[in-house]
Amino acid sequence: MKVAIFPGSFDPLTLGHLDLIKRGSALFDHLAVAVMTNTSKDAWFTVDERVAQVKEAVAGLDNVSVITATGLTVDLMNKIGADYLMRGVRNVDDFRYEKDIAAMNHYLDDQVETIIFLADPKYQYLSSSLLKEVAMSGGNIAALLPANINEALQARLEKRQMKRVKKENEEAR
């Protein structure tokens, strides 16, 4: 049985991520989407919120599970019996980064096999960070996210804006 893991912060999960998940689910017997924490990023959603969002987005994919963990991806792979580490790349910069991560993972565990998927050209410009930035500036990103995640992002954006306005009002006093 071919088991793969697709780790990421998914804050939020985009249609680019979902496309990779669908493609991976067609290739592997089982695909575990691992919602991880990236300490270098400012998360809008908690890990539990992201897990719930991703579960809803992949509900129709019977061979896909959604998990979470902390620590090294290679340790998680060993824990769940994953043979392959699935990654997506949008451009040359992503490839260079993923190549280095793959080399480190192989150093940590020489059984780790990284499979790199090229992003569908219609999603090559997408990143969670870019979508959050566009949303904060009032841009319409609904067509780039699963519907459930767009709703959650819009609600979170309103909450963040209300906090900002409240803070500005308090500072003005």
Swiss-Prot record:
Q: Where is this site: Transition state stabilizer?
A: H17
Q: List residues binding ATP.
A: S9, F10, H17, G88, V89, R90, E98, Y123, Q124, Y125, L126, S127, S128, S129
- Example GO molecular function term? pantetheine-phosphate adenylyltransferase activity
Subcellular localization(s) per the UniProt record: Cytoplasm
Q: Name one GO cellular component term.
A: cytoplasm
- Catalytic activity as recorded in UniProt: (R)-4'-phosphopantetheine + ATP + H(+) = 3'-dephospho-CoA + diphosphate
Function of the molecule = Reversibly transfers an adenylyl group from ATP to 4'-phosphopantetheine, yielding dephospho-CoA (dPCoA) and pyrophosphate.
Q: Which family does it belong to?
A: Belongs to the bacterial CoaD family.
For this entry, the protein name equals: Phosphopantetheine adenylyltransferase
User: What is the species of this protein?
Assistant: Limosilactobacillus fermentum (strain NBRC 3956 / LMG 18251)
Gene that encodes the chain = coaD
